[in-house]
């Protein structure tokens, strides 16, 4: 069974280690579930959790991690990986995620000699994930991948662990993923994207949206609720918020159905 496989994988990974692993927890359901599973496995010890903060991390993700750390008695390290000062990251190339994860894992390795775990899952292997290359270089382990567990099983496991509605938490990559490839990533831009998405969620509770900063427009994409349910009155309110936050005019704002990875643009050479 998946749960037993995961337990065996973790036991093998920590065998003969002098320290418990540090789990890199972004605030998404994958890394949260891994951390809760491991904390249940080592109930008599505080597990080590690292959470990176910065302009690319939504504030709600950080708040979520802090609450869970208190609930499950994690030894939480809030770290600033400072990738926003890395010119390679700022340039926003197609492999931007590599530089983000490189900064993350180097920061974690600076304060622990123990193993580092990530919440990457089996489904991630079918997508372009340069962050996995950075993980490999830093000798980071991925228990879910080793146990052959994908997102669907993770959600089931989260439910079994008593995480309730969190088991249905929508996927939400970092805010930098909203910026079209090649457009420089800045603190101000990421803060505005976060502010815009939070404003929409205030108008539409539980909305699953992406505000993508594209070369020629701001693309507001709806996964939930569906775009055809957004009436003109609501669009007008959202447009007004966008004009105020980004200092743009309404002709550069579009409403679209969510499309995964639509801000990621491969170069013509590729």
Q: For each of these PLM feature ranges, what is it?
A:
Residues 1-160, 218, 233-249, 257-270:
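ATP-dependent adenylation/nucleotidyltransferase module used to activate substrates
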Residues 137, 172, 252:
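A residue-level signal for beta-strand positions that form part of recognition/binding surfaces
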Residues 132-136, 177, 194, 198, ...:
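A sequence-level detector of short, solvent-exposed, charge-rich linear segments
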Residues 84, 180-182, 225-227:
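A short, flexible beta-alpha/helix-coil linker loop
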Residues 215-234:
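A short interface-forming secondary-structure element
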Residues 210-212, 219-221, 253-256:
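Conserved active-site loop/cleft motifs that coordinate metal ions or position small ligands
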Residues 145-210, 257:
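Mid-to-C-terminal catalytic subdomains of enzymes
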């Amino acid at each position: 069974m998946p749960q037993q496989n995961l337990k065996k994988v973790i036991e093998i990974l920590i065998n003969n280690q002098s320290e418990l692993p540090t789990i890199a927890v972004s605030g998404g359901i994958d890394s949260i579930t891994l951390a809760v599973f491991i904390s249940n496995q080592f109930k008599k010890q505080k597990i080590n959790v690292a959470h990176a903060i910065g302009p690319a991390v939504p504030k709600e993700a950080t708040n979520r991690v802090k609450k869970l750390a208190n609930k499950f008695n994690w030894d939480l390290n809030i770290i600033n990986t400072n990738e926003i000062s890395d010119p390679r990251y700022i340039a926003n190339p197609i492999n931007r995620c590599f530089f983000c994860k490189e900064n993350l894992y180097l920061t974690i390795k600076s304060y622990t000699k123990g193993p580092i775990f990530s919440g990457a899952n089996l489904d991630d292997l079918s997508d372009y994930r340069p962050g996995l290359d950075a993980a490999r270089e830093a000798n980071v382990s991925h228990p879910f991948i080793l146990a052959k567990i994908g997102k669907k099983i993770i959600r089931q496991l989260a439910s079994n662990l008593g995480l309730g509605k969190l088991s249905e938490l929508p996927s939400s990559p970092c805010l930098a993923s909203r910026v079209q490839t090649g457009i420089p990533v800045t603190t101000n831009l990421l803060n505005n994207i976060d502010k815009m998405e939070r404003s929409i969620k205030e108008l539409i509770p539980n909305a699953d949206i992406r505000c993508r900063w594209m070369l020629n427009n701001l693309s507001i994409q709806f996964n939930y609720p569906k775009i055809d349910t957004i009436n003109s009155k609501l669009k007008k309110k959202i447009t007004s918020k966008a004009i105020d936050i980004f200092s743009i005019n309404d002709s550069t704002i579009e409403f679209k159905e969510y499309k995964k990875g639509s801000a990621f643009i491969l170069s013509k050479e590729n």
